[in-house]
Amino acid sequence: MPDTKIVLIAGPTASGKSALALKMARETGGEIVNADSMQIYGGLPVLTAAPSPEELAQAPHHLFGAVDAADAWSVGKWLAAATAVLDDIAARDRTAIVVGGTGLYFRALTHGLADIPPVSETQREVSALLYAAQGEPEFRDVLAALDPEAEARIEIGDRQRLLRAHAVAIATGKSLTAWQTDTKPTLADGTWTGLVLDPPRAQLYDRCDARLGLMVERGALDEVRAMEARGLEPALPALKALGYRELAAHLRGETSLDQALDAARQETRRYAKRQMTWFRNQTPDWERVETLAPYGSLRDRLPPEGEEP
């Protein structure tokens, strides 16, 4: 990928990432690239808080609503599409502003995406059964013998990552750490800088709560109704958007709207908390921003030529 100035803006839902990205794009003449696994899909722009038509008109946007909800996109598919977009932006000597809340997308950019062979469902089930039979402490001992680095870095209680590391090591004969170590970053050092929006938790939760009500006022129920009419497979990623399940249940007459919104608010808070924890652990060297106020002119946030982030 050609050298270019790239800004990565990450953070939990409702933290103000899109507003910051748009402000930067206006000031620098930059272009915004989506790094949110829900906003990649079309059909739910209000529910997923995708940029509005007015916002889209203020700066070039890429990979928003680019995929039909019937498709299931992976990190690998997003990385391939994002890399092509970043190459194009670089060729035109523009600033790329990558914004979103999907941590694995950012990790794929900054650490690369390991080309790990598929792990069979049978092996995943075996790993899960072993975990259930042994409990986490003993399972960690087993994993430590296979992949000591992974065992050391995976937090207590993170069952999913423990199972993944174990299954990969058994299925491939090579530890997950080794696969990742052999992988080169997609973005070259010195070409990007990273910012994480990390507002006070109480403030973030208030924003999450308020936003859901506004989404309903702006047509989120109509979006869900139209999507339900398509009869799509419920397991599709697009239908896992925050609030979708609860609003769909309301439309089926299973809950009142107030009950649906209360349940959606609780789930949104839990998701935001998980995002905050992930970015705190996985991007410790990125600059933290609690509020948009101190930024003034955002042109200064771009990395000087040749300077590492």
Swiss-Prot record:
InterPro entries: Dimethylallyltransferase (IPR039657), IPT (IPR018022), P-loop_NTPase (IPR027417). It catalyses: adenosine(37) in tRNA + dimethylallyl diphosphate = N(6)-dimethylallyladenosine(37) in tRNA + diphosphate. The record marks 102, 124 as: Interaction with substrate tRNA. It holds the Pfam family IPPT. Its cofactor is Mg(2+). Gene3D superfamilies: 1.10.20.140, P-loop containing nucleotide triphosphate hydrolases (3.40.50.300). Coiled coil: none annotated. Residues 36-39, 160-164 are annotated as: Interaction with substrate tRNA. It is an enzyme of class 2 (transferase). This is tRNA dimethylallyltransferase.
